Curated annotation (Swiss-Prot):
Family per similarity comment: Belongs to the CpcT/CpeT biliprotein lyase family.
EC number: 4.-.-.-
Keyword Lyase found: yes
Protein's organism: Gloeobacter violaceus (strain ATCC 29082 / PCC 7421)
Official protein name in the record: Chromophore lyase CpcT/CpeT 4
Gene giving rise to this polypeptide: cpcT4
């Protein structure tokens, strides 16, 4: 199987960091994270809808995004949804998610995650330099790095103030360690 196909297969699923949150409740809340492949979303590669929810507020999904998995180089392009509210909760609603189209999304320049195989996992990182901004004119930038395995997804998402470099949001205690839920 090609690296592209392996990432596609491994990424799709439902993840939870409950074990981490129970072991380190001061630093982590229990979160469920979905990566749902959306057939035919883009003209090339594979499209994924991703969303997360705190297990304390299971009916309030947040951080909905769309990713496009591409090859040569192996990478994930990040997209924001033009109308977050319309798609909130769609990770658990296949019928609604089936209506998602590329024109419902807006690419986030500078937010590409470049993937590299490292033994039995893949690592993903953005180009350094603070180029990933969620909205034009943002005074802060985002940095994301992750490790993906067949049954794990460790991710460190952080926001920084552009002029000072001070971290403004995200984990200060390391990556969220998600394990794939087998149903």
């Amino acid at each position: 199987m090609s690296d592209w196909q392996t990432v596609r297969t491994w990424l799709a699923g439902t993840y939870s960091n409950r074990a981490q949150a129970m072991a380190e409740p001061v630093w982590f809340i229990p979160v469920t994270l979905w990566y749902v492949e959306v057939a035919g979303l883009f003209g090339e590669g594979a499209g994924f809808f991703t969303e997360q929810v705190s297990e304390h507020t299971p009916n309030q999904p947040y951080r909905s995004r769309v990713l496009q998995l591409l090859d040569n180089p192996l990478r994930l392009e990040n997209y924001r949804l033009k109308d977050q509210k319309v798609w909130a909760g769609a990770a658990k609603d296949p019928e609604r998610l089936g209506r998602l189209r590329a024109d419902d999304c807006e690419q986030l320049p500078g937010c590409t995650l470049y993937l590299e195989r490292r033994g039995e996992t893949f690592t993903g990182k953005m180009q350094p330099g603070g180029g990933c901004r969620l909205f034009p004119g943002d005074a802060s930038y985002v940095e994301i790095e992750f490790e993906l395995g067949e049954r794990l997804f460790f991710t460190l998402d952080r926001g920084f103030e552009a002029t000072t470099g001070e971290q403004t949001w995200g984990s200060r205690a390391g990556a969220y360690r998600y394990l794939k839920q087998l149903h």
